[in-house]
């Protein structure tokens, strides 16, 4: 299962893409969450991101995957790329995984 959502905190709106196995689509807490980050000029909406998420959640059905757009990438509304905002986005996504999804373990998968 896949859905899009935004994390709206601290005046930011982080565009996210969320994946879980269909057998866990009604769950709200996941012990394991993989955060997918992309390279410069890319976005959360690549085929590689979807392929990774589908492969991971089919093998490890209790995992969730979150991909997000960095500032000035994909569907993000920002017009100027600033490293401090990149760090804020990553912190907001990490906090969401821990606080909202209840992640006990976080993983990172990066593509370029």
Please describe what each predicted stretch is.
Residues 1-29:
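N-terminal cap/lid segment of alpha/beta-hydrolase-fold proteins
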Residues 3, 11-12, 18, 50-54, ...:
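Polytopic alpha-helical membrane proteins, predominantly small-molecule transporters/carriers
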Residues 13, 62, 103-105:
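A generic structural signal for alpha->beta connector loops
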Residues 21-70:
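Short, surface-exposed "cap/lid" segments of acyl-processing enzymes
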Residues 41, 50, 71-85:
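Cap/lid segment of the alpha/beta-hydrolase catalytic domain
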Residues 46, 76-77, 112:
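Short linear Ser/Thr-Pro motifs
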Residues 80-101:
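Alpha/beta-hydrolase active-site loop
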Residues 101-112:
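Alpha/beta-hydrolase fold nucleophile elbow
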